[in-house]
Swiss-Prot record:
Location within or outside the cell: Secreted
MF terms (GO), sorted A to Z: aspartic-type endopeptidase inhibitor activity
UniProt name for this protein: Major pepsin inhibitor 3
Entry's family note: Belongs to the protease inhibitor I33 family.
CDD domains: API3
Tissue-specific expression: Body wall.
Keywords: Aspartic protease inhibitor, Disulfide bond, Protease inhibitor, Pyrrolidone carboxylic acid, Secreted, Signal
Modification sites for Pyrrolidone carboxylic acid: 21
Organism: Ascaris suum
Length: 169
């Protein structure tokens, strides 16, 4: 019983460390844009609701993507070019522990929360600078045997934490 408890606690502790320090990603568009029931999704995140003339444009876009995908088997950008309501093609996406940022929008649990504030943008920029510095430090480190169980060895480098807006709402 004592061994089981110790192993369970050790497993919980190491998974907590790995989860809190290493789960983030950054990518640049274009991202997949889909339309369902007048709702636009970009990168599977709710982006906007269509209104007015955009409703017809959305239906035509969905039909064109369906045709390009299932009939023509042509996924080239010329065939599947999204309308402007899908957002800019060079948007950035950040997936942090606790939230995602796509373009100027904050999502938690894949639900839109709010647009980013100027302070949020500054935090993202600071995070990007810290990540660049962390990666440069990592490159300059001598080869090692890795990080057992996702834990940073004593005195090892740690990546920066995610922006505070991912944890404070």
């Amino acid at each position: 019983m004592h061994v089981w408890l110790i192993l369970s606690l050790a497993s919980l502790w190491t998974s907590s460390i790995a989860y809190s320090q290493f789960l983030f990603s950054m990518s640049t568009g274009p991202f997949i844009c889909t339309v369902k029931d007048n709702q636009v999704f970009v990168a599977n995140l709710p982006w906007t609701m269509l209104e007015g003339d955009d409703i017809q444009v959305g239906k035509e876009f969905a039909a064109r993507v369906e045709d390009c995908t299932n009939v023509k088997h042509d996924m080239a950008p010329t065939c599947t070019k999204p309308p402007p309501f899908c957002g800019p093609q060079d948007m950035k996406m950040f997936n942090f522990v606790g939230c995602s940022v796509l373009g100027n929008k904050l999502f938690i649990d894949q639900k839109y929360v709010r647009d980013l504030t100027a302070k949020d943008h500054a935090e993202v920029q600071t995070f990007r600078e810290k990540i660049a510095a962390f990666e440069e430090q990592q490159e300059n480190q001598p080869p090692s045997s890795g990080m057992p169980h996702g834990a940073v060895p004593a005195g090892g480098l740690s990546p920066p934490p995610p922006p505070s807006f991912c944890t404070v709402q």
